[in-house]
Amino acid sequence: LCEMAAYEKSKGKTLFDKMIELYIQYGFYYENLISITKKGMNGQQEIMDMMEGFRQSPPVTIDGEAVLTLLDYELQLGKNLQTGATWKLNLPKSNVLQFITAKGSKISARPSGTEPKIKFYFSVNTELKDRASFDSKYQMLQEKINGIITDMQLNQP
């Protein structure tokens, strides 16, 4: 990282400048996570029920985007939600679900094994054409994650 910073500085640029160049070349990806803790005696069961609900009835859309793929690492199974086609996942077994939308957004759910807590990981992306649009695109991606949280009703206690 230090070598990269020094190299960019020698060209009169910053690491931020380089990051923007990479976003323009490969796409602007933004990630975030939330953690939900359920209280009381039934907290762990509520989380298990939430996962089972997502597993048995995956969302058709999330924040207006069609959900194309469900990856179920517990069952080690991938499923195309449009065609019903399935395939085996060759990854370690874990109680994780991942939804992938038509525009490449990814939402992953992973419950804790030891406490009544579940984490949701969000990855969203967009095209970035130039540095001038960075701030507006960044805000749009943040709003997109907030829209996903609202649509999946994850902002409720």
Feature annotation, model-predicted:
Residues 2-110, 128-134, 138-157:
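Phosphate-binding and adjacent anionic-ligand microenvironments
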